Amino acid sequence: MNRAFSRKKDKTWMHTPEALSKHYIPYNAKFLGSTEVEQPKGTEVVRDAVRKLKFARHIKKSEGQKIPKVELQISIYGVKILEPKTKEVQHNCQLHRISFCADDKTDKRIFTFICKDSESNKHLCFVFDSEKCAEEITLTIGQAFDLAYRKFLESGGKDVETRKQIAGMQKRIQDLETENMELKNKVQDLESRLRTTQVSTSPAHGVTVMSPSTDIFDMIPFSPISHQSPTSARNGTQLPPIPSRSAETKRDLFGAEPFDPFNCGSGDFPPDIQSKLDEMQEGFKMGLTLEGTVFCLDPLDSRC
C-alpha cells in the first residue's frame, strides 16, 4: 500500500478513528474537474493539472457557466463525490487507489488528489476549490489513509479481499443508482408524451364529424344521384325493375300503334272464339305460360 501521506505525520488528526471507520466526514466544495496525468504522484504533476483545469474554468466562466458544487464523503474506504441535492454518486474513488493528495500552497482554496481509475487503469487528477477547508480536507484524507493502513497491518492483509468485495458492491450500487435515475427520466418522458397525445386527441382538438343536413321535418333531403338499394323479395331474389312509362303511346317506325290482340277491332267474335280469347286473357292475368298450346288466330285476322 502506498504511503502517499507520510509528510502529514507531524500533523494532529482532526477526527476520531470511529468517525472515519464507521461513518464518513462530509465536506462541500466546488469541482473544477479531473484530467489524466502521466505519473501517480508528484507536486509538479498536480501543479500542471491544476493550471490546466483553472484555465478551463476561466473559459467556462467567460461563457457564463458556473462551477458545479459537490459533496465529498471521506472515510477509510475512499472519497465519494456526490451531487449535493440528489446525493447521486458522480465518482467513487477507493482509498487504496488514491496515490497522492495535496493542497496548493500558492492558492489556499485549491486541493487535489490523484486516483487510478478502476476501468481504464489511467491516473486521474481531481481538483477542487474550497474557500475555507482546502487544507482540512487534505488532512482528513491523510487521516483516513493512515487509519486504513494501520488496519491493514493489524489484520495481516486478511481484510484486503473483504474490502475488494465491498468496493465491488459499492460500484455495483453506484451503477444501479445511475440506471435507476435513467429509468426514472425515461418514465417521466413517456408520461409527458402520453399526456401530450391525450390532449391532441381530445374532442376540443379532434376532427368534428359532420352529420348530414336535414330539412325542417328532420328528414334527409332527396338526392337524384343517391344510390337506392333494390328491394329484395322474400326468397332473397331481387324483384324485376319497374318499366318506365312514357307520356305518349309508343309507336312503331311507320307511326302506327303496336298490335294488341285483345283490342284489334270493335266487332264481336263467334262465341267459341270469344270464349277462347277470354280464357287466354284470364290466363295471362294469372301469370299463365303457354307451352305447346295449339290454337289458331285465322278468324281473328279476318276480323281485324
Curated annotation (Swiss-Prot):
Lineage: Eukaryota, Metazoa, Chordata, Craniata, Vertebrata
Gene that this sequence comes from: Gulp1
Highest rank taxon of the organism: Eukaryota
Protein name, as recorded: PTB domain-containing engulfment adapter protein 1
PID domain ranges (all copies): 21-176
Organism: Mus musculus
InterPro entries in the record: Adapter_Engulfment-Domain, PH-like_dom_sf, PTB/PI_dom
PANTHER family reported for this sequence: PHOSPHOTYROSINE INTERACTION DOMAIN-CONTAINING FAMILY MEMBER, PTB DOMAIN-CONTAINING ENGULFMENT ADAPTER PROTEIN 1
Record's subunit section: Homodimer. Interacts with clathrin and MEGF10. Interacts with GDP-bound ARF6, but not with GTP-bound ARF6. Part of a complex composed of GULP1, ACAP1 and ARF6. Interacts with ACAP1, LRP1 and STAB2.
Gene Ontology cellular-component terms listed: cytoplasm
Entry comment describing in which tissues the protein is expressed: Detected throughout the brain, particularly in Purkinje cells, hippocampal and cortical neurons (at protein level).
Similarity field: Belongs to the ced-6 family.
